[in-house]
Amino acid sequence: DIGTGSGILAIAALKLGAEVAEGVDIDPMCVRTAGENAQRNGVADKFTVLVGDLSDQASGEYNIITANIVAAAILSLAPHVPVLMAPGARFIASGIIDERRDEVLTGLKAAGLTPIEVKEKRGWVCIICKKSDEKEA
């Protein structure tokens, strides 16, 4: 969970059956809050929260990568996402205002991601992507 903030996306994933989750945020206060929220929700043993940004904290491969942050941050981190995606993984970007939809879609494509679904509701956009080089099943 990039820009984990309160940790809500990672905590929800764990509550819905994910085995483990990692969150990263540049704000140490958010990292502390996410850890406290994980403790309150009984998932602290499965949730690792790190201070920093995606490029210096995330490593390995992930099945799902989430980012519920502003468009500018999504565009900035997008080039780092494909290398972190396991085969068949999905990147879910949300927190995008509808005025920035096309700009974010263009940026995700330029970063090596292929949008496979775009959802819009009440002025907000969520974009689900796969890696551009992912083979069709």
Which functions belong to the PLM regions below?
Residues M29-T33, A73, R100:
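Conserved short alpha-helix immediately C-terminal to the canonical SAM/SAH-binding motif I
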Residues G17, Q39-A44, V83, P87, ...:
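Short helix-capping segments at alpha-helix termini
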Residues A34, V70, L108:
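Residue-level signal for inorganic ion chemistry
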Residues D1-L54, A58-E61:
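Conserved SAM/SAH cofactor-binding pocket of Class I
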Residues A93-D98:
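Short strand-turn motif at the edge of the Rossmann-like AdoMet-binding core
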Residues I64-T66:
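Hydrophobic beta-strand segment of the Class I
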Residues T114-A137:
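Core SAM-dependent methyltransferase catalytic element
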Residues L75-R90:
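A short glycine-rich, Lys/Arg-flanked "PGG" loop and its adjoining helix->strand segment in the class I
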